[in-house]
């Protein structure tokens, strides 16, 4: 009952005119970002962090949340019409969605994607509403050893999952940890790794690193290395579904949601695995004529299931972010930085210290899902027109936003220099397949992990055995080892079978 009352209070905040406008703006911008290939919600949120620094925190987080799940809706549009996924999570949608478009059923594909996203997003939000407070209630009982191990778990999962190589992921993480050490020592107050530069005494701004690695690096990499995308010509039919489409889509939506929701809750989740699993499930369950459409005319289940799985995963990913402070994707890593930009640390205490903010954010998820359904079904033609924006103008606009935002934080020319140095490093990282999200996670969680490690060692009087004295600590150590070793074991088994 307490949860219901808190949610009602959250609706009271989220339904204010100001917050509704921010939610609408975020959903519209998120959809546009999802439609435009190569930009993504992580880049957009990173770019807007400095610009929204003076905005009320509740309005700002509702705005960022709108961008976050709005991009998932928009990503399906280009996947279906142009075979160009706006988001990596929409890759599976393109497999059947584009074939449907080429066979004259673009309208049905877009409709099942939008409605499926709404169904999965709403169910996912219910899961967040019911389970996030429970996770927070248990997590608040953890001590410094458990908190330190949770952060190590965040380091290992982000490094292992967000890159093609665990080694590259760990290398990126250690870069972030090293950058996070720059500035004043939290205990002694002595400067560390500043190189005698006064500008480094307060450390390097997280926002600066996020904007440099995501926005600036994205643009520079696209300009330097990416070729022109060849667009396919698919006519946009009326967005609707007949009775047969509904009959085939509804079970696929529910199955996709059931597959995607758990993946969002676990630190090693991600959207790629559940969307592929959903596609494989739908293809396996299809029979007769429905099965024959897979890979040929395009099967509607192959769009409905993966889109539902995608949006369920994206929504429930807020559970580990809000309750444990663990990001499971590039965008949630940037959202973690957004909270810190306002001096708030996501974790078990968030539901007590910032309850009004959390429940307004959860309420905005329900509101945003309805907004996105309205935005995506009737206005799909408008979103497709965004693809006509010339790439040079689009990239120039992103760089201008990033530069103005970075300079506006401290009016420092040194920050601008640092922004483009970080951007250049980001280009090199992308070129050699080093993931950038672990850098941001290392920067944010590194100092916090250091503080918890010192507290744990103080409690244990300098003995490392403090980390194996409680069942939760032992369980977390087992999970960390599993996350590091499981991918190698699976690859080894696959290699043996192939041999």
Report the location of each language-model feature:
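Short helix-coil transition sites and intra-membrane helix breaks within transmembrane domains
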Residues: 33-42, 80-91, 123-127, 263-273, ...
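A structural-propensity feature for long, helix-poor, extended segments
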Residues: 68-79, 86, 298-324, 328, ...
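Membrane-interface alpha-helices at helix entry/exit sites of multi-pass transporters
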Residues: 58-62, 99-116, 288-303, 330-333, ...
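Transmembrane alpha-helix interface/packing and boundary motifs in multi-pass membrane proteins
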Residues: 27-41, 70-83, 158-163, 258-269, ...
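Re-entrant/interfacial helical elements at transmembrane boundaries that shape
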Residues: 41-51, 64, 79-99, 130, ...
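Transmembrane helix-bundle signature of multi-pass membrane transporters/permeases
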Residues: 31, 47-50, 64-72, 113-118, ...
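Helix-loop-helix hairpins and the membrane-proximal interhelical loops
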Residues: 1-60, 133, 137-140, 191-299, ...
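Membrane-embedded alpha-helical modules
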Residues: 111-227, 341-494
């Amino acid at each position: 009952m307490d949860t219901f009352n808190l949610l009602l209070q959250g609706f009271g905040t989220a339904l204010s005119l100001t917050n509704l406008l921010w939610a609408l703006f975020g959903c519209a911008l998120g959809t546009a970002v999802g439609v435009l290939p190569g930009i993504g919600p992580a880049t957009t949120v990173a770019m807007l962090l400095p610009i929204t620094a003076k905005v009320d925190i509740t309005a700002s987080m509702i705005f960022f949340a709108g961008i976050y799940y709005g991009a998932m809706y928009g990503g399906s549009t280009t996947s279906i019409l142009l075979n160009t996924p706006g988001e990596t999570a929409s890759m599976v949608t393109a497999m059947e969605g584009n074939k449907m478009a080429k066979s004259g059923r673009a309208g049905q594909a877009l409709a099942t994607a939008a409605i499926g996203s709404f169904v999965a997003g709403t169910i996912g939000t219910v899961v967040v509403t019911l389970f996030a407070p429970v996770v927070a209630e248990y997590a608040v009982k953890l001590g410094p050893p458990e908190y330190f191990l949770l952060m190590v778990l965040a380091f290992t999962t982000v490094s292992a999952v967000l890159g093609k190589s665990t080694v590259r992921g760990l290398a990126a993480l250690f870069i972030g940890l090293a950058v996070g050490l720059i500035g004043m020592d939290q205990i002694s107050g002595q400067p560390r790794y500043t190189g005698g530069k006064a500008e480094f005494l307060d450390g390097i701004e997280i926002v600066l690193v996020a904007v440099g690695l995501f926005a600036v690096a994205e643009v520079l990499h696209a300009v330097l290395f990416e070729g022109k995308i060849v667009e396919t010509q698919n006519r946009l039919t009326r967005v609707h579904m007949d009775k047969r489409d509904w009959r085939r889509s509804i079970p696929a939506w529910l199955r996709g949601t059931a597959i995607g929701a758990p993946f969002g809750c676990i630190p090693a989740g991600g959207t790629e695995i559940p969307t592929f699993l959903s596609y494989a499930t739908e293809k396996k369950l299809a029979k007769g004529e429905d099965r024959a459409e897979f890979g040929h005319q395009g099967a509607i289940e192959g769009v409905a299931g993966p889109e539902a799985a995608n949006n369920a995963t994206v929504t429930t990913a807020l559970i580990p972010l809000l309750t444990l402070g663990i990001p499971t994707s590039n965008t949630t890593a940037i959202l973690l930085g957004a909270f810190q930009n306002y001096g708030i640390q996501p974790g078990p205490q968030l539901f007590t210290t910032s309850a009004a903010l959390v429940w307004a954010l959860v309420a905005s998820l329900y509101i945003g899902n309805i907004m996105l359904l309205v935005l995506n079904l009737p206005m799909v033609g408008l979103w497709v027109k965004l693809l006509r924006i010339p790439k040079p103008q689009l990239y120039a606009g992103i760089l201008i936003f990033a530069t103005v935002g970075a300079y506006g934080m401290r009016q420092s020319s040194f920050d601008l220099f640092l922004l483009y140095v970080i951007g250049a490093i980001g280009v090199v990282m992308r070129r050699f397949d080093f993931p950038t999200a672990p850098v941001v996670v290392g920067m944010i969680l590194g100092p916090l992990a250091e503080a918890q490690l010192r507290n744990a060692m103080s409690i244990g009087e300098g003995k490392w055995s403090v980390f194996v004295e409680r069942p939760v600590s032992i369980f977390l150590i087992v999970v960390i080892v599993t996350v590091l070793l499981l991918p190698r074991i699976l690859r080894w088994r696959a290699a043996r079978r192939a041999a």
